[in-house]
Amino acid sequence: MDVYHDLVDDKRLITATGFRYTYENSRASSLLVEDLQISSGQLVVLCGKSGSGKSTFLRLINGLIPDYYEGKLEGQLEIANHLAGKQTVEECSKQVASVFQNPSSQFFHKYVKHELVLPGENHGQSAAGILNKLEKLTADFALEDYLERDLSTLSGGEKQRIALLTALMQYTNILVLDEPTANLDRSGIEQVASYLSILKQEGKTILIAEHRLDYLKDLADRYLYFDQGVLKRDYSKKEFDSLTETERHDLGLRSQDLSSSISKLEAKKQIAPSPLTGDLTIKNLCLQAGDQELSFLEVANFKSGAITALVGHNGRGKSTLAFYLAGLLDDEEADFYLNGHALSAHDCLKQTAFVLQEVALQLFSDSVQKELTLGLKKVVDASNILENLGLKGLEERHPMTLSGGEMQRLVIASQVLTKKKSVYL
């Protein structure tokens, strides 16, 4: 038995008293938790708007703060009998397994199988034990076709699944997940919910920062509500479930009932396409991931000034199609036309703004303000877009200290300021 597991006998696995954390170069505190106790075996949902402190709290639990995100810690936060900030990430990983918003940031190997067995190897588990767990995971999640896949060929949703399963291969008491379903389709979300249920029955302590709340309704024991970096409310399941849709909306939270969300979407007035002229046409495009053919487009037409949604299950070619449209991939057999004029991949690239699923890969500067204007040929006033996208006041923050939602809005803002003809999200 691992020594860290032996230490966790107290039901109070995580406690905080008068705890405050401030990111380096930040004027105001980034997280304040006055009083909190989380017992072993609970599934706790961290909810609140983007930038409310959810990701910061998880970074403290898994040791990324202060090892990778420097700042000032005040008060007391204790995880499995260890004070926050007193252990290295390596030491914390023996107690806490993590799933990040950006799954590629936690991959070390080229192939899926090697990535899955890495945690057990790092923690000195027996080869037989590792293989037994891998076989069980493979059976439970139908991974047979993925084990030999190159991680770089997976879609965003597929990468997120592998990151989750890699965390599940670890022998830890605590599992923290930062928006684990952000890029998953409905079947993938249901698989996550199913396995979280199993882990909860095994007595694991699970902390999930989420905006999607519907799949957690029957799993959550508590909901921690964060607002502007402060833990404002600690709801029991009964208290949270009794909130009205109006109260939930006022808190900036999504519904627990998907049907009500769908009806609201249907009731919204449809946005008419812009009167701009010009169509983008694709002919004879084969969508591939590595050597695997995903689908074939004989002809596809995209109206200028319109919003087009690419929908489908994970791994079916949505992101791959967007890469071709943006000129990031090239198919010599395919034809691209704008207003009837042939386009090369380079032509597509020059006129396209693109926002990746893994937005951290598009952040290069050391402040939000510099990131917004990076590469622009003319000086622009970014105050309006900062205000509109909820980034006002963050101009001096390092982009990598932002929440996942704030990073995404920052990249969207920087791409919009380029004033390219097409935007792909």
Question: Can you describe what each PLM-predicted range is?
Answer:
Residues Y4-A16, R20-E34, I65-E70, T88, ...:
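A short, flexible loop at the N-terminus of ABC-type nucleotide-binding domains that lies
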Residues Q76-E91, D335-C348:
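ABC ATPase NBD Q-loop/coupling interface
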Residues A128-Y146, V380-L394:
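Conserved ABC ATPase "signature" region
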Residues D150-L154, E158, H398-L402, E406:
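Conserved ABC ATPase signature
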Residues L164, I412-A413:
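Hydrophobic anchor residue at the start of the ABC signature
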Residues A167-L168, V416-L417:
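ABC ATPase C-loop
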Residues L175-D178, V423-L425:
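Catalytic Walker B motif of ABC-type/P-loop ATPase nucleotide-binding domains
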Residues E210-H211:
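H-loop/switch region of ABC-family ATPase nucleotide-binding domains
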